[in-house]
Amino acid sequence: MDYDRIRPVRFLTGVLKWWRLWPRKESVSTPDWTNWQAYALHVPFTFLFVLLLWLEAIKSRDIQHTADVLLICLTTTALGGKVINIWKYAHVAQGILSEWSTWDLFELRSKQEVDMWRFEHRRFNRVFMFYCLCSAGVIPFIVIQPLFDIPNRLPFWMWTPFDWQQPVLFWYAFIYQATTIPIACACNVTMDAVNWYLMLHLSLCLRMLGQRLSKLQHDDKDLREKFLELIHLHQRLKQQALSIEIFISKSTFTQILVSSLIICFTIYSMQMSPVLQDLPGFAAMMQYLVAMIMQVMLPTIYGNAVIDSANMLTDSMYNSDWPDMNCRMRRLVLMFMVYLNRPVTLKAGGFFHIGLPLFTKTMNQAYSLLALLLNMNQ
């Protein structure tokens, strides 16, 4: 049926192309390491900003100051890892999206399937908009407030080769941060959303496969051909799951590693700062905290959806009209159901299964680190 199967991600890849993080050609089989425009954009902003933040964190001698620096330093470090990852593996994701949008194997063939896609796309768009508001909403509080502070103060602490507290030199550092922060935010939000959409679409394809399996009838014309086509669809989805894991594994693993520290340092900074004396700063930190929690929660939700959709395939096959099929077909059904017992899961870094248990572990680790910091402060 006539429906754009990958509608939400087209906007996201368009944004990534603008920031030189996505192949500009439609069919690319290898990473393009000669993209000098990408280097010219991200080296002076993304990677230099990360370096300056780490230098400030290393030179710090105070726990609270170190926490204030690390909460943004770790975020930008994860961003740098995501940028390198997408430069290396964007062609893999581009190939998968091309298959989903053009191959007849993934064509939507009923109103029920179109409605399912349309509903999930609308919900994904709402989630993405809320995530954008939480992430981008921090920028005005962070960037505008320092303009009214006396003495001068940068949005984030970072090392500079000059004394930025001098009135004239302050503006060089401030303009650099005011330019870098929106760029980092836009790239980070968009790359996260592409990862989430790949997992969402994979779970939708598995649900579509389950619906088609449950509708198989013993008196269907070309029953064997339909069933073999569904087996081929399942095999292709498993291959795509491996490719998606290659694309999202390292970036998700990096995000999981730093998320517990970021959440910990954010809450610690909020507790150590006087709320009534700095309401805009407190509001910014609250939004930042929500965005960081969403950054680790949403991939686990979409990863869990892949696991659940794959696990439901056996039940869907069992709910078909297999008892009335001939012996040869029942034998094929039995072999396929045994094959379905192999789980379809996505891993982060080859270690962690991307699912809701990973989110709870990350939050528990953040709480433990926060308790340790508070005890050290006492």
From Swiss-Prot:
Keyword annotations of the record: Cell membrane, Membrane, Olfaction, Receptor, Sensory transduction, Transducer, Transmembrane, Transmembrane helix
MF term (GO), any: odorant binding
Signal sequence annotation: none
Transmembrane segments: 38-58, 67-87, 128-148, 167-187, 256-276, 281-301, 344-364
Pfam families referenced in this protein's UniProt entry, alphabetically: 7tm_6 (PF02949)
Gene Ontology, cellular component aspect: dendrite membrane; plasma membrane
Extracellular-facing ranges: 59-66, 149-166, 277-280, 365-378
Cytoplasmic compartment spans: 1-37, 88-127, 188-255, 302-343
Membrane topology: Multi-pass membrane protein
InterPro entries listed in its UniProt record: 7tm6_olfct_rcpt
Similarity annotation: Belongs to the insect chemoreceptor superfamily. Heteromeric odorant receptor channel (TC 1.A.69) family. Or2a subfamily.
The protein's role, per its UniProt record: Odorant receptor which mediates acceptance or avoidance behavior, depending on its substrates. The odorant receptor repertoire encodes a large collection of odor stimuli that vary widely in identity, intensity, and duration. May form a complex with Orco to form odorant-sensing units, providing sensitive and prolonged odorant signaling and calcium permeability.
The protein's assembly and partners: Interacts with Orco. Complexes exist early in the endomembrane system in olfactory sensory neurons (OSNs), coupling these complexes to the conserved ciliary trafficking pathway.
Additional facts recorded: The atypical heteromeric and topological design of the odorant receptors appears to be an insect-specific solution for odor recognition, making the OR/Orco complex an attractive target for the development of highly selective insect repellents to disrupt olfactory-mediated host-seeking behaviors of insect disease vectors. Odor-evoked OR currents are independent of known G-protein-coupled second messenger pathways.
UniProt-recorded name of the protein: Putative odorant receptor 71a
